[in-house]
Structure formats: C-alpha cells, structure tokens
C-alpha cells in the first residue's frame, strides 16, 4: 500500500534528462517491424524509404516506446515508489519527425500530472525525444494507474521474481531518503531541454497512396485482421524490453487476477498504427496517435488470438489537407480500444 506520508502529487514536475543517448539501429527497426507485423517496405529496405524521401529505414510509429521504457526506468524504480505495479490506460504519440536508422535520441522525462479517480492514482509521464540536430522529434504521454497491495497480492511480486530474466527489476525498492535525494538533484540540475519542434512532418509533402480529394467524412478504411500467438508475445517482450510475465506466463497471469495470458497493450497499439500507415502508404503521414485502452486481448496457449481493426474518417480539413481517423480494435468481439484517434496528412 502507498505510504500515507508519501505524497506522489508532490513529485509533479519532477524531470530529468537521461545521461546517454539511444541510437536507432537499422536491424532493431526491422526487428520491431516484424514484432508488430508491419510489412511496409520503408521499414525494411533503404530503397523503399528513399523513394518516400527518408534518409534511412523508417521506424514504426510505436518504436519510440523502446527508448521511453529505458528512460522511464529511473522514474519508476528510484523516484516513484509505494506502488505494487502499474496498469497502462492511455497513450498519446506526437510525431514531429519520423525516426530513421542512425538517429540519436536524447530523452527528457517528466512526471506531468497526477490525478485521483475512484480512489486510484492516475500518473501521466511525458517523454520528450530530441535528435542529434537539437530538434524535438517525438513527444509521448503515458498514463498509468498506480496499483497498491489492495489490487495486487504480495505473492505476485515474489512469483514474478522467480521467473523473470536475471538482472531485471519489475518494481522499485528505493527508500524515501533516496527519493528525496533524487528529487532534489533533478530539480537543481534540470537540463535545458530542446524547445524547437521539428517541422518535418508538418511541412514535408506526404507521399500517401490515398489522396485527400478521394475521401469524405464517414469513409471506412478496409478492415484488417491480425493473429497473435504466445510466440509473438514472447518475441515482442524481448524486442521491446518489456519483461512483465503476465504476457507469457500462465501462472503469473492467473495469480494477477487475469483469465489468461494477455497481449501487451503497446503491441496492440503497434498493430493499430501499422493498420493506419499501411493504408496511407507513407509512415510519416501519421502525425498524432492517441489510444485509450479499455480491455485486454487474451492469447491462449493452444490457439492464436485474433484482433480486428477498422477505422473511419471523423473529420477533414481542406486547407491543411489533413484528416482525423477514429480507430476501432476488437479481440474476441470485445473492444480493446476505448477511444483511439489518428491525425494524418494526405497527398
């Protein structure tokens, strides 16, 4: 249970810059594209990427979650304590420039807001990624619910510790003294974060295969189905660096109160993003992607889980040749995205 003397709202605004940069690797882009089943040629060959005007292999939309997870480790392991776990609820990607192989990302992390809903703490973390040119290329907002001992049994943590890979920390064990020291240091040495947003995605001529003139409000995207096996979940866990065993271990999933192993929320979002960019024909034409998770996708051991994606045009802006999409994702007939939207630019 959260320590009554420890007020997480006092940490709002806590921020730091990760000491080292994250370099987007050519083969890592391909690994991640395979993990989210994204076959767009720009993720796989330099020739296809160059034909769209990119300098290297283009990373899939949700690829940025990998450096974000690395960057947020300090926040959740050494700064925010008292929770037994976290449940992801919302994710927003602001895409100012597509990531390409060779990019060096400098990460700024901030605890943006803390809200209480139905007695639970909802924490929103902001990740700002600056490239080697000093421009902000991606901003990501992640909202999680802090889970206490009332939500997660104590034996769950012990069971997880027995099955996760050596050297992986799932929950924090920092003391309040360490928190105070870390908090003070971060405020005293706050980095000069980049303020210039890259205008690449807003000024570049999109190379979409669909044109603005061919669309109307209410237009429905061709539906897409995705198939997930336990092997897909294990692969995504390794590629993304998400060690949570509820995504691959039956016993831990059941002990955590789940009916079975479930797919990573970020994996389902990655599949959804690929659904959008495959239809567009240009990964860089997606400028904002927002998802609220409302349910989980179960993946049984004996059979694959099937996900269904559909979408429609919510609005069109003829002056900017942009559109807003509403995306629906279902698993076993249940909606797993409560609300999902995408801002796109069109040729």
Model-found features: residue ranges?
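Hot-dog-fold acyl-thioester-processing enzymes
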Residues: 1-90, 154-288
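Generic detection of short hydrophobic beta-strand segments and adjacent strand-loop junctions
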Residues: 22, 142-144, 225-228, 291, ...
């Amino acid at each position: 249970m959260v320590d009554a003397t420890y007020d997480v709202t006092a940490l709002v605004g806590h921020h730091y810059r990760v000491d080292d940069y994250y370099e987007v690797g050519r083969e890592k882009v391909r690994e991640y594209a395979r993990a989210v089943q994204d076959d767009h040629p720009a993720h796989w060959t330099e020739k296809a990427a160059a034909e769209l005007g990119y300098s290297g292999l283009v990373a899939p939309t949700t690829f940025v979650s990998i450096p974000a997870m690395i960057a947020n480790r300090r926040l959740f392991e050494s700064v925010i304590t008292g929770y037994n776990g976290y449940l992801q609820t919302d994710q927003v990607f602001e895409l100012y420039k597509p990531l390409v192989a060779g990019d060096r990302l400098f990460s700024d992390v901030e605890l943006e807001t803390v809200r209480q809903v139905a007695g639970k703490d909802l924490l929103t973390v902001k990740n700002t990624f600056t490239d080697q040119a000093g421009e902000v290329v991606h901003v990501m907002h992640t909202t999680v619910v802090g889970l206490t001992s009332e939500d997660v049994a104590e034996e769950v943590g012990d069971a997880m510790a027995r099955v996760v890979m050596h050297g992986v920390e799932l929950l924090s064990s920092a003391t309040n003294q360490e928190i105070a020291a870390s908090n003070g240091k971060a405020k005293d040495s706050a980095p000069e974060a980049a303020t210039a947003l890259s205008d690449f995605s807003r000024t570049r001529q999109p190379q979409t295969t669909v044109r603005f003139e061919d669309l109307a409000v209410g237009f429905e995207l061709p539906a897409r189905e995705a198939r997930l096996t336990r092997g897909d979940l294990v692969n995504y866990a390794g590629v993304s660096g998400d060690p949570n065993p509820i995504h691959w271990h039956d016993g831990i999933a059941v002990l955590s109160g789940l009916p079975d192993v479930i797919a990573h929320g970020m994996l389902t979002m990655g599949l959804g993003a690929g659904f959008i960019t495959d239809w567009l024909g240009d990964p860089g034409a997606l400028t904002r992607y927002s998802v609220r998770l409302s349910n989980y996708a179960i993946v049984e051991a004996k059979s694959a889980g099937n996900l269904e994606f559909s979408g429609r045009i919510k609005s069109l802006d003829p002056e900017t040749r942009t559109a807003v999409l509403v995306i629906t994702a279902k698993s076993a007939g249940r909606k797993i995205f409560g609300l999902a939207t995408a801002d796109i630019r069109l040729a």
